Amino acid sequence: MQQPFLPADFTLASSTALVGPYGSGKSEIALTLACLMARRLQARPDNRLQVALGDIDVLKPYFRAREAGEALKAMGVRLLAPGGSLKSADLPILTPELGCAAREADTLLVLDVGGDPAGARALGSLRDEVDTNALDLLLVLNRHRPFMESVESVVEQADKIQRASGLRLTGVVSNTHMMAETTLDDVALGLELARRVGGALDVPVRLIGLGRAIATLIERDDLAPSLLQGIPAIVLDSALKPAFLGGCALSPGAP
């Protein structure tokens, strides 16, 4: 997968956790970021880092990162999630490897966190393992999801997540979309809300999520300078959605 809107020097903190309500797209973003970083690191001859993706989305067992386990392994991403009979469990199960990975200096850890305050408590249980000074806690925002349509409602959800996890948000990810029906207006309105939410929380907009079709349109018509406003954007290919919902297979050639 080409990433035309992501600078070549784009990188992640030692630990990056993505939080937000169900349907915001955090699992897709977590998976894509992990694969992207693994690919970029593997291209460096002096690289000593590895990438791990921790799936602690313990609530709704839909579109979770663990569903792409075999493909992630082939792409050099270490998946940390319950396996075997517990793979589909809708239970607050955290693997011991998560705590170990959080302490490893040679590991970039990406965390896919549950979609509401109850799920954020799972992240809170790792608080003593993670260097909070090197943790990015990013709120993924899709304006078209319930309770995400106004600054006040988003900030209320954000405050609940912060209290539940015992951690402070460090940024916002704008990922407003309508799947295949996403328009340029959706991207613009989503970014506008994300900026206002960021202002209310005193954190920056760190990233924009774009579906493949809308990203192609933006690149073709050279709309990035005006639409994305200098904010890095990551192209998402719906690797976690089943084919009947427009998903695609994750392969070692992507992203």
Regions found by a protein language model. Give the residues of each.
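N-terminal phosphate/diphosphate-binding loop that engages ATP/GTP or pyrophosphate donors
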Residues: 36-90, 97
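Hydrophobic anchor at the beta1->P-loop junction of P-loop NTPases
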Residues: 18
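Conserved lysine of the Walker
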Residues: 26
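Phosphate-binding P-loop
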Residues: 6-13
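Conserved catalytic-core segment of NTP-binding enzymes
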Residues: 117-228
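Hydrophobic positions on the alpha1 helix immediately C-terminal to the Walker A/P-loop
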Residues: 29, 33
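The conserved Walker
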Residues: 22
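Switch II (G3) loop of P-loop NTPases
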Residues: 82-87, 106-122
